[in-house]
Amino acid sequence: VGIGFLLHELGHKFAAQRYGCFAEFRSFDNMLILAIAMSFFGFVFAAPGAVMISGRINRKKNGIISAAGPAVNILLALAFLALAFANPPPNIFKLVASYGFIINSWLALFNMMPFWLFDGYKIWKWNKFAYSIIVGMAFVLVFGGNFAR
């Protein structure tokens, strides 16, 4: 989860910097504490912070910067899927790759929720077609990817 989260946030940071914006990670300590507490009950989800962007930014740039995070998770999921297929069971690499696939697929789909603070909200406001494509890809990976296990 941590690697998927980190690379997701770095995707936002590098996309923002490409547009000449200042981007830095800010931690949300309360969310980290909540994530740790929830892990004791079997629910593992961590959003201990986010990349904050400042600079001249319009709706299109914000949408593209927001799309970079889920796009990174989709690419990671596809890479892990390829690794899972390249390693026949029983194999620890197949197991790790399968979990990497599942985690990154869910991270992409979860972040595409069209609600305030989520990437999906900013992408939806910018371009509904782009939103639909990214959600569609993440949906297919999450619900069509059972064969990776």
Task: Outline where the language-model segments fall.
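Hydrophobic transmembrane alpha-helices and their immediate loop junctions
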Residues: 1-149
